[in-house]
C-alpha cells in the first residue's frame, strides 16, 4: 500500500512487544512492499499504535485485524523490518478526496 501511495506516512517509532495485525482485505501482504510471497518475519508495532481502540486493528488500513502481519523475505534481507513501527498514520489524499466527493454529492453508506 505505502509503496504505491507515496503520501502515506509510517509511524516509525521504536517497536514494542505488540504484534501487528492485518484485515481480510490485506491478509497475506507484506506491510512494506505489498508482495504476497514468502512471509518471513513477524511485524512488531509500537505501544502507541496498539493502545485502546487501536488494539487488534489492521496495520495498513485500520480495519479489524484477523491475522498476524509479516514482512516478506526480501524486506527482511534488506533490513526494512528494522526501520521502526510500520503502522500507517495518515489517511492519504485518495481516501480524503473520496470522502469529500461522497459528501459533496450526498452518497451515504447503508449498513
UniProtKB/Swiss-Prot annotation:
<dbReference type="GO" id="GO:0000398">
    <property type="term" value="P:mRNA splicing, via spliceosome"/>
</dbReference>
<dbReference type="Pfam" id="PF03660">
    <property type="entry name" value="PHF5"/>
</dbReference>
<dbReference type="GO" id="GO:0003723">
    <property type="term" value="F:RNA binding"/>
</dbReference>
<comment type="similarity">
    <text>Belongs to the PHF5 family.</text>
</comment>
<dbReference type="GO" id="GO:0005686">
    <property type="term" value="C:U2 snRNP"/>
</dbReference>
<dbReference type="GO" id="GO:0071011">
    <property type="term" value="C:precatalytic spliceosome"/>
</dbReference>
<dbReference type="InterPro" id="IPR005345">
    <property type="entry name" value="PHF5"/>
</dbReference>
<dbReference type="GO" id="GO:0071013">
    <property type="term" value="C:catalytic step 2 spliceosome"/>
</dbReference>
<protein>
    <recommendedName>
        <fullName>PHD finger-like domain-containing protein 5A</fullName>
    </recommendedName>
</protein>
Amino acid at each position: 500500500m505505502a509503496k504505491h501511495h507515496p503520501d502515506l506516512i509510517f509511524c516509525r517509532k521504536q517497536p514494542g512487544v505488540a504484534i501487528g495485525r492485518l484485515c481480510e482485505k490485506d491478509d497475506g501482504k507484506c506491510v512494506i512492499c505489498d508482495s504476497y510471497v514468502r512471509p518471513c518475519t513477524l511485524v512488531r508495532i509500537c505501544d502507541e499504535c496498539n493502545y485502546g481502540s487501536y488494539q487488534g486493528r489492521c496495520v495498513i488500513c485500520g480495519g479489524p485485524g484477523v491475522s498476524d502481519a509479516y514482512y516478506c523475505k526480501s524486506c527482511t534481507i534488506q533490513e526494512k523490518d528494522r526501520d521502526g513501527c510500520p503502522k500507517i498514520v495518515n489517511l492519504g489524499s485518495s481516501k480524503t478526496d473520496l470522502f469529500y466527493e461522497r459528501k459533496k454529492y450526498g452518497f451515504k453508506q447503508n449498513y
